[in-house]
Amino acid sequence: MRRTLSAALVVAIPMLGTAGAATLIERLVVFGDSLSDVGNVEVLSAGLLPPDPYFDGRYSNGPLWIDGLAEGLGLASARVPVLEGGTNFAFAGATVVPGGADTPPVPTLQAQAEAYRLSRLFTGIDPNTLIAVWGGANDVRSALATHRTDPAAAEARVRAAADGVGGIVRDLIDAGGDRFLLVNQPDIGALPAVRAQGEQAVEEARSLTGLFNEAFAQQLATLDEDTAAELITLDAFELFEQLSDPGTVPSFDNTTDPCVAGSTMCADPDEHLFWDEAHPTARAHAVGAEEALDALRSANPHPVALASPAGAVPSAVTSAVAEPA
């Protein structure tokens, strides 16, 4: 039986802090890595990264999940990099916490959030702001690189990253933040870049992903007990597990190989789950956007500031999610 992704997916991680009355979402602020970067690294590198055939400063072949979410909320500033005056602070390559010498010279998620917090120092964070936080994949991949030689240090690095997300949210709550969209990690072992390292690497990466997600869930549970903030969650691990299942609608013919490999590009990116060795295609991102919008609607069944009529998913998202002809 073919299964269709639905809003039920978002309850795979418990929905937290949703008892309060619904309020309008008037702005969207984003912290993250290449899965959410809409052009900050492109600006930082004077247009050198990402190279062609990547789309408009994004590490994919088209709009990212955050583009679809921002469109659905009618909040265009989240589709503009902070380096160009927008509210998207995500940088490709970013880790949650500072790493070793292999860490790219871009702001960590902690630094991104601190920059935003300082910018709101005198005014506070408007309670109608939705803050999206998705990071940790690069911390897990960095830990994987040292796991065989020093597993204890690698696991400590992963826990520190998950704890770092919790610290970011707590600091932003203290600054006035009241509504958050928080995303865990998909199976890092499923990335083509990790598959290429062999089965042991795949198993280690999956284990480290599980460690991160467990610590991440513990952080959210503590925040839910200690604060009154609305913590809306999206289970990226379960989402990618379902997208990798050929019985799921929408389906992808190829869920293991990248569309782009060196100078070679596949004939139809929409049939691939992965655009390159580490990033999803635009079609996969569109599914994520739809699920994020459904998560917001599930948390707030009363009207929130959705741009689309009757809470419909934007056409740009639905067209990408639809089964290819």
What are these regions (language model features)?
Residues R2-G20:
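Gram-negative bacterial Sec-dependent N-terminal signal peptides
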